[in-house]
Amino acid sequence: MLLIDNRFYLIGRQDASEQSDFGATRASMSELTKDLDDNVFSIVMDHQPRDYAAQAKSGVDLVVSGHTHGGQLIPLTTLMKLTGIGGNDRVYGAETRENTDFIVTSGIADWEIFFKTGCVSEFTVIDIKGK
């Protein structure tokens, strides 16, 4: 966790797959946010869009994720959105839960195969206008 210019916290979260694949310990949201000043805007970067309930409960302001590549391929794009295949809370887009905003981008690249169908590559610009 970093406090940037006394204006906002930037909180990086260990990738969830490192916990399952390599036995790494992933800190809980309550551990990561226990020392935050609630009056300062907080941003969590979490590679995979998982753990939304704990992130919203922690009171952070914004969570940004990627990982899903927007579904990457037809029919996965639709199947992931409808069924939650892959264990993600969201495949693409934005939503708000308990005053926490969540944004999942499809990113600019692919994974393992060198193309995408049914989703766009994108750079995401987020405008934050104070707390």
Write out the residue ranges for each language-model feature:
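Soluble catalytic domains of enzymes that build or remodel membrane lipids, polysaccharides, and related
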Residues: 1-131
